[in-house]
């Protein structure tokens, strides 16, 4: 029996009709759906309610119903377990969602027949060190960003790669992105577009004060060190635009490739460049 985690974005599937139809399909095909306990109660399937950790760790695969933001959140939570994700779009066209809701059930039929592939996406790991002690760590599928607040002055951030000094960025912040994240915030800040399955790390200053400060692409084996080089009352580190932590003068952030990957289920012969053209036309 397949155990399948169903994770809806309740802001996009407000009445949970899509979620309920997925659960019914899974039950009809002899599978056991795993649901958040609150969601399970709302649709009358309390016995299928599970704790979050059990959903991510024990499911054979996950169905994420939402948009790119939903996928980013699910990716971080299930990465330690390597659980594959079928990303279903319930909103605007995204870079991460594999299918639309109208394609969901034919896609599930393909998965149950073994007609799918797994695409591995590189992730990042960040560690914040304060007074020589690690205080928090993050993982990200898209990017790790250091940014200033709305009313604070420019940040001064020293960047090193493998202890080799790169530059001191006087800027609104710095983005460290994966290839998956190269089409997100990094692209808006002038960074390069990188094919999503290539493994590199992209460093992009945000609105730098000096014209020569440009994006740098480094090896996935490199370790990036960012040092907060000046007092600034309002600096934050954020991961995938969803988690945040306040950082201060003399804090040090180490960023490297994570040992964990996001495993995306692919059921279509989709073309990244077709998707890229569609998204850039939207912009």
Curated annotation (Swiss-Prot):
Keyword Disulfide bond annotated: no
Cellular localization per UniProt: Cytoplasm
Keywords: ATP-binding, Cytoplasm, Kinase, NAD, NADP, Nucleotide-binding, Transferase
Keyword Cytoplasm annotated: yes
Residues of the active site: 68
Primary residence: cytoplasm
GO molecular function, one term: NAD+ kinase activity
Binding-site positions, NAD(+): 68-69, 142-143, 153, 172, 183-188, 242
Enzyme class: transferase
GO annotation (BP), single: NADP biosynthetic process
Domain of life: Bacteria
Cofactor(s) in the UniProt record: a divalent metal cation
EC number: 2.7.1.23
One GO CC annotation: cytoplasm
Catalytic activity: NAD(+) + ATP = ADP + NADP(+) + H(+)
Family to which the UniProt record says this protein belongs: Belongs to the NAD kinase family.
Functional note: Involved in the regulation of the intracellular balance of NAD and NADP, and is a key enzyme in the biosynthesis of NADP. Catalyzes specifically the phosphorylation on 2'-hydroxyl of the adenosine moiety of NAD to yield NADP.
Stated name of the protein: NAD kinase
Species of provenance: Caldanaerobacter subterraneus subsp. tengcongensis (strain DSM 15242 / JCM 11007 / NBRC 100824 / MB4) (Thermoanaerobacter tengcongensis)
């Amino acid at each position: 029996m397949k155990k399948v985690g169903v994770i809806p974005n309740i802001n996009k599937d407000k009445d949970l009709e899509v979620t309920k139809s997925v659960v019914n399909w899974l039950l009809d095909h002899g599978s056991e759906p795993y649901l958040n306990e609150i969601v399970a109660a709302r649709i009358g399937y309390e016995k299928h309610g599970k704790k979050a950790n059990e959903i991510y760790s024990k499911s054979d695969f996950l169905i994420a119903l939402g948009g790119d933001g939903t996928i980013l959140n699910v990716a971080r939570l299930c990465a330690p377990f390597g659980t594959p994700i079928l990303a279903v779009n319930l909103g605007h066209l995204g870079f991460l969602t594999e299918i639309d809701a109208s394609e969901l059930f034919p896609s599930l039929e393909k998965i149950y027949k073994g007609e799918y592939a797994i695409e591995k996406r590189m992730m990042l790991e960040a560690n914040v060190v304060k007074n020589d002690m690690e205080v928090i760590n993050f993982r990200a599928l898209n990017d790790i960003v250091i940014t200033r607040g709305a009313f604070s002055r420019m940040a001064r951030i020293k960047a090193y790669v493998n202890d080799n000094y790169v530059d001191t960025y006087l800027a609104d912040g710095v983005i460290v992105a994966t290839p998956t994240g190269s089409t997100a915030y990094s692209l808006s800040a002038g960074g390069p577009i990188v094919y999503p399955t290539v493994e590199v790390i992209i460093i992009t200053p945000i609105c730098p004060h000096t014209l020569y400060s440009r994006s740098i692409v480094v090896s996935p084996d490199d370790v990036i060190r960012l040092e907060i080089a000046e007092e600034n009352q309002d600096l934050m580190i954020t991961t995938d635009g969803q988690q945040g932590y306040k950082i201060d003068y003399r804090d040090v952030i180490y960023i490297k490739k994570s040992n964990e990957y996001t495993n995306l289920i692919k059921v279509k012969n989709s073309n990244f460049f077709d998707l890229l053209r569609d998204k850039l036309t939207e912009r």
